[in-house]
């Protein structure tokens, strides 16, 4: 149950960066800041590392001009991390949350970030600390369960489709000198990005001619 008095929220970014990672950050902050239940929205520097070290920045204090730059910036404005939550981190994390009066946590990330969000939710409940946790999907792999398309996938899919089409034209131009081009894309155990390489095809002769996905 939400407190009658406004309390603070914390946002963290983690995992690999996507072209729209900072767009999600901006959306979370602007929406949270407009809530009557939230007083201040903080950002954790380098994700979970920043939480453990208590390194936060006040995101509600940033000007609209600053946010316009952040939304269009590549990378992760808050800094990202690959560090996973460990059981021994629990006392320190809850202590920091209590010190900063953090009652709402927004994690922006993919599989590992969603796992961290779930762990923090369980830990806060087991330790009797009131914390609402929400994960904002972020993965170019597009492999989050029950998520039709994750922010970051569309931009990367477009890039790969154009790259495949361009590589095909290059190979055609080179003729016998370099008739075959092999492109390896990211995606972990999902073939969504590989499949996206065909999005720019207009006729059968256009590249790619063979697509290999892990599901098949």
Regions flagged by a language model, labelled:
Residues 1-2, 51-103, 112-113, 140, ...:
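Glycine-rich oxoanion-binding loops at beta->alpha junctions
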Residues 1-5, 10, 34-36, 68-72, ...:
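Solvent-exposed alpha-helices and their adjacent loops that cap or buttress functional pockets
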Residues 2-55:
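N-terminal phosphate-binding or glycine-rich loops at protein starts, especially the Walker A/P-loop
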Residues 8-18, 76-80, 103-109, 135, ...:
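Short glycine-rich or small-residue beta-strand-to-loop segments that form or flank ligand, phosphate
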Residues 14-16, 44-49, 82-83, 110-111, ...:
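Short, ordered loop/turn segments at secondary-structure junctions
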Residues 18-28, 51-52, 86-91, 111-119, ...:
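Short glycine/serine/threonine-rich phosphate/pyrophosphate-binding segments
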Residues 41, 72-80, 205-213:
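Short beta-strand elements in bilobed, periplasmic/extracellular small-molecule ligand-binding domains
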Residues 96, 107-109, 116-130, 134, ...:
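Accessory alpha-helical/coil subdomains and C-terminal extensions
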């Amino acid at each position: 149950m939400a407190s009658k008095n406004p309390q603070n929220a914390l946002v963290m970014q983690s995992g690999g960066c996507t072209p729209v990672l900072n767009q999600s950050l901006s959306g979370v902050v602007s929406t949270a800041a407009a809530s009557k239940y939230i007083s201040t929205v903080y950002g954790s520097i380098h994700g979970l590392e920043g939480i453990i070290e208590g390194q936060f920045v006040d995101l509600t204090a940033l000007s609209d001009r600053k946010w316009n730059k952040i939304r269009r910036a590549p990378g992760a404005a808050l800094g990202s991390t690959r560090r996973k939550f460990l059981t021994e981190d629990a006392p320190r994390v809850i202590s920091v949350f209590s010190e900063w009066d953090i009652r709402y946590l927004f994690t922006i990330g993919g599989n590992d970030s969603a796992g961290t969000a779930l762990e923090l939710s369980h830990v806060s409940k087991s330790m009797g600390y009131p914390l609402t946790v929400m994960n904002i999907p972020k993965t170019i792999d597009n492999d989050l369960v029950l998520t039709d398309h994750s922010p970051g996938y569309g931009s990367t899919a477009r890039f790969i489709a154009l790259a495949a089409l361009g590589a095909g034209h290059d190979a055609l131009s080179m003729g016998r000198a370099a008739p075959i081009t092999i492109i390896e894309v990211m995606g972990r155990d999902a073939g969504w990005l590989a499949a996206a390489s065909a999005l720019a095809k207009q006729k059968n002769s256009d590249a790619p001619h063979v697509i290999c996905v892990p599901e098949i």
